[in-house]
Amino acid sequence: MELVVKSVAAASVKTATLVIPVGENRKLGAVAKAVDLASEGAISAVLKRGDLAGKPGQTLLLQNLQGLKAERVLLVGSGKDEALGDRTWRKLVASVAGVLKGLNGADAVLALDDVAVNNRDAHYGKYRLLAETLLDGEYVFDRFKSQKVEPRALKKVTLLADKAGQAEVERAVKHASAIATGMAFTRDLGNLPPNLCHPSFLAEQAKELGKAHKALKVEVLDEKKIKDLGMGAFYAVGQGSDQPPRLIVLNYQGGKKADKPFVLVGKGITFDTGGISLKPGAGMDEMKYDMCGAASVFGTLRAVLELQLPVNLVCLLACAENMPSGGATRPGDIVTTMSGQTVEILNTDAEGRLVLCDTLTYAERFKPQAVIDIATLTGACIVALGSHTTGLMGNNDDLVGQLLDAGKRADDRAWQLPLFDEYQEQLDSPFADMGNIGGPKAGTITAGCFLSRFAKAYNWAHMDIAGTAWISGGKDKGATGRPVPLLTQYLLDRAGA
């Protein structure tokens, strides 16, 4: 779908479908009044009959109104005379998109300037959410279907904006388009079956991305290099699988050479059986999504590349497959990490933190401004925050605050959890420096505490996306593309873009 921005009168625009908002109690905004006047009161007449109550997201399609160049007019309810919340605004846009997809028109014009959104400016903030909602709603994953989804007739959507705000709306669309591209890439990787999407496949994806972008350098560390670097925890996770582990390093130089980079670390467990600590069989197919941390880093990088942000960014993807076998890691094994700290592996299903801890140590060599790791790390985070909010922890209040703010601006929210010293005690082991689990209580926090022991050399934050990275079961099952909006917004803010 192509999104364009124009500053023209809605009543004079030629299009297959013109979309205008109508409030409750038959209230018409400036745009609706102009269209009503041009159509000789057709809008008012419909509202007087009570055909549309004007509640947010309600729609009514009108055909061939006199005095207009539009073939159809789609009225959409915008509610009472007050600003909408982000969720209501997104639902309104999705409702419009749903109607447009069912029509045979190749284009549509959205004249929604009169709708206010709470805590969003009238141009960039509001239209960024609108554009992301439209573009993300276009996503289809039918790669393995013998019958593909029929191509939609709607190819172009024009957003009408006032002249003063046109440049900001265009900027919003540019950013939204890049984020949507990144989210789609993230969702594609997450939705791929694990027999195809394994560590070596992700390494090939990185190499292809590197070939397409001169500013991006790619290095892939194989299992021998991982072992030679002393990454005993990382190596242990993959040793039970026929698919060898890979540490993928993508280095984007968009800023000045002297600028310290931001580092994103993604957990890339391409399939997680739990290892010897085997998971239950029911729902195990969804463990292909255990690489969504790495997928979201990939997606964020795609957005950054498309926008050519003036920042230096290093992406580290810690990829392995966690399988049981005669060579797999056992509960009770003790490994030495790259940092020199030893870990007693009490549960092989707590493997994400093992690949991450060595990768966090590896990140020190880049002398980063900040390091953010992203992982589908704990089921406890789903219990605590559900599927709406990402868990966030860190050792630097400024960094955590910046990420929380980015989440609000991107409507991709996170919530901070504590890393108090008392939780660290739950990781004590009688045989090693620490265990890899901290007991049944506060599992998300103790996982963060574990990682914090390997991130003391820099400002660090940990994002647990176990609840937000994918939707379980039902017709909407699949990867969500989160937290690409949050991460991209964070980097946009750092770049001043």
UniProtKB/Swiss-Prot annotation:
Domain of life, source organism: Bacteria
UniProt-annotated binding residues for Mn(2+) 1: 272, 349, 351
Chain residues that bind Mn(2+) 2: 267, 272, 290, 351
Cofactor(s) for this UniProt protein: Mn(2+)
GO molecular function: manganese ion binding; metalloaminopeptidase activity
InterPro entries to which the protein is assigned, alphabetical: Leucine_aapep/pepB, Macro_dom-like, Peptidase_M17_C, Peptidase_M17_leu_NH2_pept, Peptidase_M17_N
Statement: the UniProt record of this protein carries the keyword Cytoplasm: yes
Enzyme Commission numbers on file: 3.4.11.1, 3.4.11.10
UniProt record similarity statement: Belongs to the peptidase M17 family.
Protein name: Cytosol aminopeptidase
Protein's organism: Pseudomonas putida (Arthrobacter siderocapsulatus)
Upper classification of the organism: Bacteria, Pseudomonadati, Pseudomonadota, Gammaproteobacteria, Pseudomonadales
